[in-house]
């Protein structure tokens, strides 16, 4: 793909769903309000996805349209969406039984409990043949920008870090799994990248 062709990207945003008293609740009635709305690993979490888009304007428009539909429906149902990375409260968060959850429980074990308390935004960028290393290194360089959007320092009601989500993912949930959770170092050559993927 020549560099002049558009780079397709999509976004997934996750929100905690709360009732009018601020208690976490299931997103009943919200999933069907728009295309791209889905349940996640845990009961009170809602994910809204876009399709791959070629322009920022197209991506923004689709995300705003889908999010707007969910927000209007949430308002009708007395629900709210909370964009915090981790909930402030200390209560347990119930799993949403699924094959994905069972796999994570089997692979990650007890440490998957940390993931249950995390919501976030995920950006998917189309891989360009021949440009994989430049793309990876660019994304690694952009990662520190996460520090600018930390939204909750809490895990189970306790202040644990300025950005609890990063700490939970990188240093607790996936700490025992090489190549998962932590930020990968820059890559200098294709062979190094291939070796990492084979591990």
Question: What are the residue ranges of the model-derived segments?
Answer:
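Terminal catalytic/cofactor-binding subdomain
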Residues: 1-112, 117
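An acidic/histidine-cluster motif and surrounding catalytic segment
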Residues: 123
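Loop-rich catalytic cores of soluble enzymes, especially ATP-dependent carboxylate-amine ligases
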Residues: 117, 126-199
């Amino acid at each position: 793909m020549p560099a002049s062709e558009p780079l397709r990207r999509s976004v997934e945003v996750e929100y905690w769903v709360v009732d009018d008293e601020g208690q976490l609740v299931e997103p009943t009635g919200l999933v069907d309000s728009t295309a791209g709305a889905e349940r996640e690993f845990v009961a009170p979490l809602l994910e809204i996805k876009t399709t791959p888009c070629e322009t920022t304007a197209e991506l923004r428009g689709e995300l705003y349209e889908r999010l707007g539909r969910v927000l209007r429906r949430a308002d009708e149902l007395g629900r709210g969406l909370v964009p915090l990375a981790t909930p402030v409260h200390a209560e347990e968060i119930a799993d949403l039984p699924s094959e994905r959850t069972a796999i994570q429980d089997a692979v990650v074990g007890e440490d998957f409990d940390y993931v249950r308390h995390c919501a976030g935004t995920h950006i998917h960028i189309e891989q360009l043949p021949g440009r994989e290393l430049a793309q990876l290194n660019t994304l690694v360089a952009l990662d520190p920008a996460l520090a600018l959007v930390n939204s909750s320092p809490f895990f189970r009601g306790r202040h644990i870090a300025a950005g609890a989500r990063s700490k939970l993912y990188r240093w607790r949930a996936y700490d025992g799994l090489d190549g998962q959770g932590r930020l990968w170092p820059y890559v200098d050559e294709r062979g190094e990248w291939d070796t990492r993927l084979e591990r």
